[in-house]
């Protein structure tokens, strides 16, 4: 019997042995920087002249690796392979599929610091953020494997004396996985393994700025015994390969994590029925947020300031769950703001490969330019009291930025920034604070810092987000503990790491036999 699920513990880097082990992981990754990685279609490794070049966002001159780039023709080949492989994979035993996930999790656990080091180099994650990303990848595999074992025999339904009824789940078909750059291991691995353990075959198109960690994960799946053709690795451009596969009549479902605009585009394209298509495509989408921490006047103000700073600036604010707005009761606004500024000025920004770094770079030049444009907007809409500077000479570094005294209807309070910028806004009372928090087209995460039980219960009912936290920050959902997904334009509320997530990758079948 499989042991009960528990989340992978985070590494304590204050322990010297762990620090040394992580440094060894960095050395290992540095030893193979710049390598070429092929496409993988039906187990065949295919090298193309056209490449996706992955660079270190902390050092633009350092190439992490070059990954072959799929064309439409190769995407079509991958679709044919995945479609054919599905005919056998869908009949494979769920226990066997789960065992592959458990083996893959064990392999990653043994190579944990190596994978985290890839994330340091390719995604610009500081040690603790990279370690958490890798731990979450392990968690997804361990959790989804166990969930499949629970679902393999279906769910009991009622029968009558003269009949026997069964309710079971069967796989959907070929799934297109379009994974993000901000959690390029955890979310990519979670989306991929959820699809395959449910009996589907996969076309994996990772984010173009972080394809190397996905290529390394393909090695893990092969070592874990995954048959060729179940997961096909096809990095490529969204406009060429992504659109082609979303439109393809043999695509059964699309699992996407990324921006609102791209998510909407995928949703619209997937709704169109193409010639030869005999189903309605399913879309599983997580699309971002404009997340708020509300601070009540009856609250632990030190906890409030620490929660805001950690949630706003962890991984440079590049989390869909990051705190982008701090809405604070006017009676305690100045105290919380001043303390948050103090804490922010203590943060170190620099090379994430160095242990003491709190914040690394943003993802790429486009991200840098976008965030700095919002810093400029912040100068007009409020007062910059911390940060406000950026330097893209070597890498894409932006100082953690607090914009104070922002009006509730300002752009900084409405638009997703996806960087280390947080707007502070005053609220007249708790009801006003909740109204400001809900005044957005998103609904992903939120937090309330309060010692008032009535206010906590009011927020539990009225704060319209998919993941709501009390007296803590608004980031850091744990697989199996806080299933993750949001409302409104944050996506389809597909709760990753939750008990109903695998069912999104399957269809229910009822059989009834007369006795």
Swiss-Prot record:
TM regions (residue ranges): none
Residues of the active site are 286, 320
Record keyword Oxidoreductase present: yes
Q: Which GO terms describe its molecular function?
A: 1-pyrroline-5-carboxylate dehydrogenase activity
Documented EC number(s): 1.2.1.88
Per its record, the protein catalyses: L-glutamate 5-semialdehyde + NAD(+) + H2O = L-glutamate + NADH + 2 H(+)
Instruction: Name the enzyme's class.
Output: oxidoreductase
Pathway in which this enzyme or protein is active: Amino-acid degradation; L-proline degradation into L-glutamate; L-glutamate from L-proline: step 2/2
Q: Which GO terms are recorded in the biological process aspect for this UniProt protein? A: glutamate biosynthetic process; proline catabolic process to glutamate
Q: Which UniProt keywords apply?
A: NAD, Oxidoreductase
Gene Ontology terms, cellular component aspect? cytoplasmic side of plasma membrane
Q: Which domain of life is it from?
A: Bacteria
User: Which InterPro entries does the entry mention?
Assistant: Ald_DH/histidinol_DH, Ald_DH_C, Ald_DH_CS_CYS, Ald_DH_CS_GLU, Ald_DH_N, Aldehyde_DH_dom, Proline_metab_enzyme, RocA
Q: Entry's PANTHER family?
A: DELTA-1-PYRROLINE-5-CARBOXYLATE DEHYDROGENASE 1, ISOFORM A-RELATED (PTHR42862), DELTA-1-PYRROLINE-5-CARBOXYLATE DEHYDROGENASE 2, ISOFORM A-RELATED (PTHR42862:SF1)
Q: Which family does it belong to?
A: Belongs to the aldehyde dehydrogenase family. RocA subfamily.
The identity of this protein, by name, is 1-pyrroline-5-carboxylate dehydrogenase
Q: Which organism is it from?
A: Bacillus cytotoxicus (strain DSM 22905 / CIP 110041 / 391-98 / NVH 391-98)
């Amino acid at each position: 019997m499989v042991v009960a699920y528990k989340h992978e513990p985070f590494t304590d880097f204050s322990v010297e042995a762990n620090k040394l082990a992580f440094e060894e992981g960095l050395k290992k990754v540095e030893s193979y920087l710049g390598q070429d990685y092929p496409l993988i279609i039906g187990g065949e490794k295919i090298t193309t002249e056209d490449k996706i070049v992955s660079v270190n966002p902390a050092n633009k001159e350092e190439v992490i690796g070059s990954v072959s780039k799929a064309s439409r023709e190769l995407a079509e080949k991958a679709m044919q392979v995945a479609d054919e492989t599905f005919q056998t994979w869908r009949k494979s035993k769920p226990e066997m599929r789960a065992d592959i996930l458990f083996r893959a999790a064990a392999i990653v656990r043994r190579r944990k610091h190596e994978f985290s080091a890839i994330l340091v180099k390719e995604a610009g994650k500081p040690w603790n953020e990279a370690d958490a990303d890798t731990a979450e990848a392990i968690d997804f595999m361990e959790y989804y494997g166990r969930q499949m074992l629970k679902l393999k025999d279906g769910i009991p339904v009622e029968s009558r004396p003269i009949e026997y009824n069964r309710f079971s789940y069967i796989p959907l078909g070929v799934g297109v996985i379009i994974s993000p750059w901000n959690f390029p291991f955890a979310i990519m691995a979670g989306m991929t393994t959820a699809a395959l353990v449910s009996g589907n075959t996969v076309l994996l198109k990772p984010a173009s700025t972080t394809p190397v960690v996905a290529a390394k994960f393909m090695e893990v799946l092969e070592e874990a015994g995954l048959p060729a053709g179940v997961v096909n690795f096809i990095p490529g451009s969204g406009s060429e390969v992504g659109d082609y596969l979303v439109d393809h009549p043999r695509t059964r479902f699309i699992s996407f994590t990324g921006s609102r605009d791209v998510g909407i585009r995928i949703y619209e394209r997937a709704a169109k029925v193409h010639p030869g298509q005999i189903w309605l495509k399913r879309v599983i989408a997580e699309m971002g947020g404009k997340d708020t921490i509300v601070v009540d006047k009856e609250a632990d103000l030190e906890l409030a300031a620490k929660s805001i700073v950690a949630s706003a600036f962890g991984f440079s604010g590049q989390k869909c769950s990051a705190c982008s707005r701090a809405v604070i009761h006017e009676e305690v606004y100045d105290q919380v703001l001043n303390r948050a500024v103090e804490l922010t000025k203590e943060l170190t920004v620099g090379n994430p490969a160095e242990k003491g770094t709190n914040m690394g770079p943003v993802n790429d030049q486009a991200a840098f330019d976008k965030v700095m444009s919002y810093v400029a907007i912040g100068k007009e809409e409020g007062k910059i009291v911390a940060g406000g500077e950026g330097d893209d000479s070597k890498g894409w570094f932006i100082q953690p930025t607090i914009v104070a005294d922002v009006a509730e209807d300002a752009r900084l309070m409405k638009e997703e920034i996806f960087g280390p910028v947080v707007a502070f806004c005053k609220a007249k009372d708790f009801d006003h604070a909740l109204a400001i928090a809900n005044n957005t087209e998103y609904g992903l995460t939120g937090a309330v810092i309060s010692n008032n039980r009535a206010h906590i219960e009011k927020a539990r009912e009225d704060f319209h987000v998919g993941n709501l936290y009390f007296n803590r920050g608004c980031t850091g959902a744990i697989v199996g503990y806080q299933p993750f997904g949001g409302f409104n334009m944050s996506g389809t509320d597909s709760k990753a790491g939750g008990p109903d997530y695998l069912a999104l990758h399957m269809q229910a079948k009822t059989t009834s036999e007369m006795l």
